[in-house]
Amino acid sequence: MSTARTIRRFSTQPVDDVTLARCLEAATWAPSGANAQEWRFVVLKSPEQRAVVAEAAAQALKVIEVAYGMTRPAADDLSRRARDNRATYELHDRAGEFTSVLFAQKRLRMASDMLLAGSIFPAMQNLLLAARAQGLGACLTSWASYGGEQLLRTAVGVPDDWIIPGHIVVGWPKGRHGPVRRRPWQDAVNLDRWDERADDIASAAVVD
């Protein structure tokens, strides 16, 4: 898990069906509310569907640029932020080249979309971890949000009584996996109350 960082730069080597099938099977091992398993994982790999994915990615990029104040970095900018932004732009520019998976969850009248999404987010995480275990790279995207949701819904034929909580690109990484960069976990954990640090738990942690 500590090396399952988001991969945005992929080689041109296609993902074989055997490796992809292992990832999809692992996704089904995730918990599901009431074990209903009212989920669907749609693999997008045909040229026609990849073209739709590319269009959805282009729409998402316009929103991302505004939301994060992001622009294409200058060629001589060697900062970490510039490197990260280059990877983001490369992912969006090449969106039509990749195999990806669209995740859908059936709506229930008594449950909010957020609650329902909780029944498929674990499956998405399982796929990410299974991809990493096999050396694949993966990126959870926002391409099924914004205007891209309707594009993908129409292209795939997702019924109106299903929500689309997420979309993941998979591929062989260009480069290698590495450790994730995270703030100390102790900064995100509290004990009993919002404003109480969990220092006792932190002090008991075993550091490898």
Model regions and ranges:
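Generic N-terminal amphipathic, Lys/Arg-enriched alpha-helix
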Residues: 1-13
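Small-aliphatic-rich amphipathic alpha-helix that forms the alpha element of a beta-alpha
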Residues: 22-27, 102-155
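Glycine/small-residue-rich phosphate/adenosyl-binding loop
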Residues: 37-119
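C-terminal helix-cap and adjacent tail motif
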Residues: 6, 163-208
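Short alpha-helical scaffolding segments that buttress acidic/His motifs in well-ordered protein cores
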Residues: 1, 23-27, 168
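A glycine-rich helix N-cap at a beta->alpha junction
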Residues: 62-73, 154-181
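Glycine-rich phosphate/pyrophosphate-binding beta-alpha loops
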Residues: 28-36
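Conserved, non-catalytic sequence blocks in retroelement Pol enzymes and Pol-derived host proteins
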Residues: 16
